[in-house]
Amino acid sequence: MTGPSLFEPGMIVKHPNQPEWGLGQVQSAVGGKVTVNFQEAGKVVVDEARVGLVVVSYG
């Protein structure tokens, strides 16, 4: 079972291992899965337990 997400819709993030994706805006965060709309990669679902997204702006 996962706790509450650290991410909220509207936050701007970047993926630490995929800088070419550009910045992304968090769309939703449910059950440890964060849906992010990245500038170059489009919509990507990220597993919070496996990837430490970097917060750039709190929206």
Whereabouts are the PLM-identified features?
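Mixed-charge, Lys/Arg-rich low-complexity intrinsically disordered regions
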Residues: 1-12, 20
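SH3/SH3-like beta-barrel fold
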Residues: 34-38
